[in-house]
Amino acid sequence: MRAVASAAADRTHYLMRPDLGRRLAGDADTRLAAYAGSGHDVAFVIADGLSARAVEMHARPLLEASLPRLAGWRIAPLVVVRQGRVAIGDEIARALCADIAVVLFGERPGLSAPDSMGAYLTFKPTPQTTDAARNCISNIRPEGLAYADAAVTLTHLLRAMRARQISGVQLKDDRLLLDGE
C-alpha cells in the first residue's frame, strides 16, 4: 500500500478548492511511478472524499470480495489518498501505468447514509478525463449495495472495459444482477 496526499493542504482547502483535491501533492506522481513496472491492468485507489468513515468501513471488504475475481489481472499497488477527490485516480493511474483506475470514494453523507462509499471506474484516464468517462457504483455498504453484489458489478464492468476499450456513458451495465451472483 502506498499513501499519498492531494494538493489540498487541509480540509478547508479541500472543500473550498475542489481542483486541489484532484491533483497529487508534490512529487507523489514521481514516487508512484517507481511502482509502474511494465504496467498494470487496474489501479485501486482509496480516497477519503467527503466521508472518511465510509472508506474506513467499506473499502477493505469490497476489495476482499473483488480481488479474487480478478485472477490473472496485473493489479497495481493499492494507493490511499488523503484529501482526495475522484479525479485524482486519473493522475495515479497514469503514474502507475494502469489501464483502468478504480477510485473507492467516501460519498457525501446524507440523512440516511453517513457511511456510503462509491466506486468510480475509468478506462485509460488522463488529466483531461471528464466525469462522463467514468462509471459509478454507488451506495456500497451493508444497508445499501452489499459487498458481494458490488464486487460482481465492479468486476463485470472491469472486464467489459478491457474487452470494449471504453467506459462511462458509452458503457452500460445491462446484465441482470441476481443476489449473490
Regions of interest found by a model, annotated:
Residues 10, 49-54, 84-85, 108-111:
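Gly/Ser/Thr-rich loops at beta-strand to alpha-helix junctions
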Residues 41-54, 102-104:
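Short glycine-rich or small-residue beta-strand-to-loop segments that form or flank ligand, phosphate
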Residues 52-73:
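Glycine-rich phosphate/diphosphate-binding loop of Rossmann-like nucleotide-binding domains
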Residues 68-96:
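Active-site rim loops that border cofactor/substrate pockets in soluble metabolic enzymes
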Residues 107-181:
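C-terminal functional extensions of proteins
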Residues 90-117:
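Glycine-rich phosphate-binding loop
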Residues 37-42, 73-76, 97-100, 115-117, ...:
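Short coil/turn connectors at secondary-structure junctions
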Residues 1-36:
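N-terminal low-complexity, intrinsically disordered segments
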